[in-house]
């Protein structure tokens, strides 16, 4: 009636121990339940995923993205990937200062991207690959605001191919007419 066709879910992770550590207030069963209700009602689903949350690591985050598309309980139509960043006035800032949380380096983030993007299904649209937070507000984490472009250029140079919708769009391809 109101024209809504897509719902975005701040899933962030699929790991209950990470949800507990960051005091999210729910577990992955809530993400699965919400996803099923939305799929049953014919909505498109977009997940917001957050690698580098406390309690995770590079290998675990890579496995998380694999599970998102191997497990039919998830399988969003779109995703936004927002690596966790340390910002002022947050509990995470205290953890960072105490050495309880270490943000990924740009190299670690790029490794995750290189390893997950080739496995993205053809139906998936990646609508964002890093949150647009001013570098002056980031205490810990990547300050590269064009991480998607950097990753795509490096993937092209290394011969790594992604099949997601955005990477296959004609607007970025040379046309032979």
List each model region and its residues.
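Conserved non-cysteine loop/helix-boundary elements of the Radical SAM core domain that shape
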Residues: 1-46, 50-107
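C-terminal accessory regions of radical SAM enzymes
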Residues: 100-177
